[in-house]
Amino acid sequence: MVKTITFIKRKPGMSVDDFGQYWRKQHAAIVIKLPGLRRYVQCHTIPSGYRNGEPAYDGVAEVWFDSTGAMREGAQTAEYRAVRADEPNFIDLTKIDFVITEERVQKDAPADPSMVHLVEFVTRKPGMSVEAFQRHWSGVHGPLGAKIPMVRRYVQCHVRPAAYRDGRQPPYDGVAEVWFDSTAAMRESATTPEYRAVRADEPNFIDTTHPVPFIITRDFAVL
């Protein structure tokens, strides 16, 4: 199973509310018609994410297919062309991007729709190979994060090797997804020794020359 994560900013002049409504209703009804689509989740940035200005993204769209082959086949269909044709109605196409990933579950528990969802966009530290980055993130850092008591679910989405062929560099090397019961629980997690251990490990594999972009979302499982 492969998972594509698309990073979305609303089109200029569109309100956050109108963007969310259009995405959840009109656009979702088009996407679910894609051949081969196994699962579709919309992750909408919560209102508090706008208190101090614009967040990194207004949301991310997550879609699952059985394989990259199935995904490519779907992209050749009229249904996919309909999806693309609808995007300018609510998305800023100058800022849209995506990664194709494989999930590595670090803490496996159900993600209830009432939970808040922390989505972090991760770039490996300069000079580190993709293989070493993924190995450390999954084998060392992941178990540290899973120990934080308030964490309900924790999934790492590792960008697939094909994204690096011919010297290419994807927008991010991975996406970390962590679910909490509430924003209060998320804030409380930052006071724990387990969280401090997570932060202390980050320079070992993450580019810390700038803050890690993130959004906090509520999720809508469309399919």
Question: Language-model features: where?
Answer:
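Macromolecular interaction modules
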Residues: M1-L223
